[in-house]
Amino acid sequence: MMEVFMNFLDQLDLIIQNKHMLEHTFYVKWSKGELTKEQLQAYAKDYYLHIKAFPKYLSAIHSRCDDLEARKLLLDNLMDEENGYPNHIDLWKQFVFALGVTPEELEAHEPSEAAKAKVATFMRWCTGDSLAAGVAALYSYESQIPRIAREKIRGLTEYFGFSNPEDYAYFTEHEEADVRHAREEKALIEMLLKDDADKVLEASQEVTQSLYGFLDSFLDPGTCCSCHQSY
């Protein structure tokens, strides 16, 4: 049984690796300093919807979970998101403001259809009938973040004039915290998995696709990854 489960986790990780955000053209351009300030601003404002929604994803799973140990792990992640000042939403705002976006601009921003679709995908799986699939949706995202955060910091400091660590503290925080979150989420999938392995893999496929679709929205149609890549 353990070997079968490990093969299942390998399948999950393969789905994520085959559509890793760090390989997306938008993040490749970020790492090379090839994005414009306007592209970074548009991205930062549009990503805000997901940042605000992330604690709700966790709450949706936590509130319906009967396993005490699983709830503790979910609550630990949720507390990381919302506790203290600055919390993760505050840290994201610091990044956005460092790009020259005003608080009024950020709050008045109308999220794109791609941003709404991404959040809707996460929420659908996190509120669905499979708790393991909901956690898999989170794992498919958070397991990628440490590498991405490290590369974002490098790009921001080398090419985009970021010298104050507070301006990219959101990424510094997630470079470390999401290593633990991903490890805990992998354990949670094992704890919560029933006969819903297919849903777990489906959740990962849909989430990784929605993440790519969101990043595509900041590129010219001819360079978007979803237009000419298949996995």
UniProtKB/Swiss-Prot annotation:
Source domain of life: Bacteria
Family, per entry: Belongs to the CADD family.
Keyword Secreted: yes
Amino acids binding Fe(2+) 1: 81, 88, 174
A molecular function GO annotation: toxin activity
Disulphide-bonded residues: none
GO biological process: small molecule metabolic process; sulfur compound metabolic process; symbiont-mediated suppression of host tumor necrosis factor-mediated signaling pathway
Annotated GO CC locations: extracellular region; host cell cytoplasm
CDD domains noted in UniProt: TenA_PqqC (cd19370)
Protein name per Swiss-Prot or TrEMBL: 4-aminobenzoate synthase
NCBIfam families in the record: fol_rel_CADD (TIGR04305)
Annotated source species: Chlamydia trachomatis serovar D (strain ATCC VR-885 / DSM 19411 / UW-3/Cx)
Subunit structure: Homodimer. During infection, interacts with death domains of mammalian tumor necrosis factor (TNF) family receptors Fas, DR4, DR5 and to some extent TNFR1, but not with the respective downstream adapters.
EC number: 1.3.3.-
